Amino acid sequence: MSERTKATLDEFFRRMSTGDTDGATELFADSVAWDIPGATDLVPWIGPRRNRAEIREFYDLLDKGLIKDRFDVERVFVDGPHAVAIGRLRSTIRSTGKVIQTAFSLEFEVDDDGRITKYLMLEDSWHVANAVLP
């Protein structure tokens, strides 16, 4: 299972690095436990999602809301169907011009079919929320 998990995440990050968000979305299962905790009243792209259509909406809102300057995955740890990726990101909020620079971790679970069933992103949500404020 660890090899399947690693292969799925390698493909996910490869697609993301080329801007293929449609392709990355296809790697998710039909039903997903997705969350990016934070101030959902201020930041429209964060919060829970439950299926591919909602994940697609996330990427659309993200692209409208910010410019992705960097998204560097530094390490990926895999244990069976579970994985954690850690890294750093830098983005610019389109509406304010403010920069978000933060470490992040991503928790994943991958099923027997190689589909992502869990995605939990942890980042400096306070910094993100303040960056969208004028």
Task: Report each predicted region and the residues it spans.
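Hydrophobic pocket/interface hotspot
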Residues: 12, 24, 32, 51, ...
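A solvent-exposed, acidic/Ser-Thr-rich amphipathic alpha-helical stretch
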Residues: 29-80
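Short, mixed-charge, low-aromatic patches
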Residues: 10-19, 42-46, 61-66, 86-88
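A beta-strand edge to alpha-helix "cap/lid" segment located at domain peripheries
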Residues: 4, 60-134
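Alpha-helix initiation/capping motif
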Residues: 1-2, 44-48, 97
